[in-house]
Curated annotation (Swiss-Prot):
Protein name: Salivary protein 15 Iric-3
Family: Belongs to the salp15 family.
Induction note: By feeding. By the presence of Borrelia burgdorferi.
Subcellular location: Secreted
Known tissue expression: Expressed in salivary glands. Detected in fed adult female.
Keywords: Glycoprotein, Secreted, Signal
Keyword Secreted: yes
Positions of the UniProt region annotated as CD4-binding: 105-124
Lineage of producing organism: Eukaryota, Metazoa, Ecdysozoa, Arthropoda, Chelicerata
Top-level taxon of the source organism: Eukaryota
Any Gene Ontology CC annotation: extracellular region
Length: 124
């Protein structure tokens, strides 16, 4: 019985943390140019030919959400070769297409012509 009560307390605390995080995300929705980092020091793992990493991440997140609360993206699960990204949702994950104007190569390739896109390995 004690473990059940402890589990309830942990769940309630977790809900408060999630709610606070969601509210702080809404407050930080302004997009400013970055060089791979955002205001909190988080560095994205997108290739250097993506000009504004934070704006790109926010764009993918908005495509992913489309009315669903609790969605997120993983910058390591963006496939520039196939022009797709992983949308992580509470109950199921989806692989969605990147916008056609997304850079997908160092020579100004875009996802409009997927056959010209090149793979990217973070750190290489």
């Amino acid at each position: 019985m004690e473990s059940f009560v402890a589990m309830k307390v942990v769940c309630i605390i977790l809900l408060f943390v999630i709610a606070a995080e969601a509210e702080s995300i809404n407050e930080k929705s302004d997009v400013e140019p970055s060089k791979g980092k955002n205001n909190s020091g988080l560095q994205f793992k997108f290739p250097p030919y993506v000009p504004n990493h934070k704006a790109f991440a926010l764009r993918l997140l908005s495509l992913c959400e489309q009315g669903i609360y609790g969605t997120k993206i993983n910058d390591l699960k963006v496939d520039f070769k196939n022009c797709t990204f992983l949308c992580i949702r509470k109950y199921e994950n989806l692989t969605l297409p990147l916008p056609e104007d997304t850079p997908c190569g160092p020579n100004n390739q875009t996802c409009h012509k997927k056959d010209e896109c090149v793979g990217y390995i973070p750190g290489c």
